[in-house]
Amino acid sequence: MSSVVKSKSKNPYAAVRVDPDSDYITPGTLDLEQLFWSGPGVQYTHVNQVWPGIYIGDEKTALERPGLRDLGITHVLNAAEGKWNNVLTGADYYSDTNIQYYGIEADDKPTFNISQFFHPAAQFIHEALSQPHNVLVHCVMGRSRSATLVLAYLMMEHSLSVVDAIEHVRQRRCILPNHGFLKQLRALDITLQEARLKQKTQTQGQEKPR
């Protein structure tokens, strides 16, 4: 990989082409923000299905256990666990149901490192869907923290680019991850593109005649 790509990837406002043979370019953070304001979006509602088996919702959705039952929710990922500007549920809140709970104490602030939860959240969602079951990923409004974790899951588990993941979800739910979260999703996109390029290079090397 060229040193030019590495230096560009450190600038969150620059577009980066990781694979020189690909037409795909990871946008800068400001360009990612523009995706949420381009074209018609969907109206805000309490909960939406954004992928088979995956629902993004808000605090109201998470608190209404009968409603979760009606949706067939078997797993709840609370991306806003904690006391301040968060949703106070926890595993005990669902103890009289068959719901499996996973909580993440994430602050909806641009400076918060939500990327530390990308892999454990994706693993929880993956395990829920492998049954197959339905999982609710929520925060207070269901627009930033929960949306960010679902976008990361789609990128890691389904090989969607950050652009394709955003476009897919925003057509089904009104989402708006904060600026810092978009930076981290952009960094994830570059990391995943680099890993795929490395794998492709290794495969091509193995296929060359000796």
From Swiss-Prot:
Give me the reactions it catalyses.
Answer: O-phospho-L-tyrosyl-[protein] + H2O = L-tyrosyl-[protein] + phosphate; O-phospho-L-seryl-[protein] + H2O = L-seryl-[protein] + phosphate; O-phospho-L-threonyl-[protein] + H2O = L-threonyl-[protein] + phosphate
GO biological process terms on file: negative regulation of MAPK cascade; protein dephosphorylation
* UniProt main location, coarse: cytoplasm
Active-site residues from the entry: 139 (phosphocysteine intermediate)
Which GO terms fall under molecular function for this chain's record?
A: MAP kinase phosphatase activity; protein serine/threonine phosphatase activity; protein tyrosine phosphatase activity; protein tyrosine/serine/threonine phosphatase activity
GO CC annotations, alphabetized: cytoplasm; nucleus
Question: EC number(s) for this protein?
Answer: 3.1.3.16, 3.1.3.48
Transmembrane portions of the chain: none
**What are the binding positions for substrate in this chain?**
138-145
Q: Entry's InterPro entries? A: Atypical_DUSP_subfamA (IPR020405), Dual-sp_phosphatase_cat-dom (IPR000340), Prot-tyrosine_phosphatase-like (IPR029021), Tyr_Pase_AS (IPR016130), Tyr_Pase_cat (IPR003595), Tyr_Pase_dom (IPR000387), TYR_PHOSPHATASE_DUAL_dom (IPR020422)
Q: Where is the signal peptide, in residue numbers?
A: none
Which keywords belong to this entry? Answer: Cytoplasm, Hydrolase, Nucleus, Protein phosphatase
Q: Which Pfam families match?
A: DSPc (PF00782)
Decide whether keyword Cytoplasm is in the record: yes
Protein's cellular compartments? Cytoplasm; Nucleus
What's the top EC group for this one? hydrolase
Task: Specify the superkingdom.
Answer: Eukaryota
Q: Where is the Tyrosine-protein phosphatase domain?
A: 46-194
Tell me the protein family, please: Belongs to the protein-tyrosine phosphatase family. Non-receptor class dual specificity subfamily.
**Physiological role:** Dual specificity phosphatase able to dephosphorylate phosphotyrosine, phosphoserine and phosphothreonine residues, with a preference for phosphotyrosine as a substrate. Dual specificity phosphatase able to dephosphorylate phosphotyrosine, phosphoserine and phosphothreonine residues within the same substrate, with a preference for phosphotyrosine as a substrate. Involved in the modulation of AMPK and MAPK1/2 signaling pathways.
Which PANTHER family does the UniProt record give?
AGAP008228-PA, DUAL SPECIFICITY PHOSPHATASE 29
This protein's name:
Dual specificity phosphatase 29
Q: Which organism is it from?
A: Takifugu rubripes
